[in-house]
């Protein structure tokens, strides 16, 4: 559904952010 797809998208962005922080990059 639309809600689940949105949730997956947000989770993906969050995951990318965590990986970025672990790598030591700053937005």
Swiss-Prot record:
Disulfide bridges in this chain: 20-25
GO cellular component: extracellular region
Localization, UniProt: Secreted
Predominant cellular place of this UniProt entry's protein: secreted
Tissue occurrence: Expressed by the skin glands.
Signal peptide: none
GO BP annotation list: defense response to bacterium; defense response to fungus; killing of cells of another organism
Keywords of the record: Amphibian defense peptide, Antibiotic, Antimicrobial, Disulfide bond, Fungicide, Secreted
Family listed: Belongs to the frog skin active peptide (FSAP) family. Ranatuerin subfamily.
Function: Antibacterial activity against Gram-positive bacterium S.aureus (MIC=40 uM) and Gram-negative bacterium E.coli (MIC=2 uM). Has activity against C.albicans (MIC=46 uM).
Protein name (Swiss-Prot/TrEMBL): Ranatuerin-2Cb
């Amino acid at each position: 559904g639309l809600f689940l797809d949105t949730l997956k998208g947000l989770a993906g962005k969050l995951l990318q952010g965590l990986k970025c922080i672990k790598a030591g990059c700053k937005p």
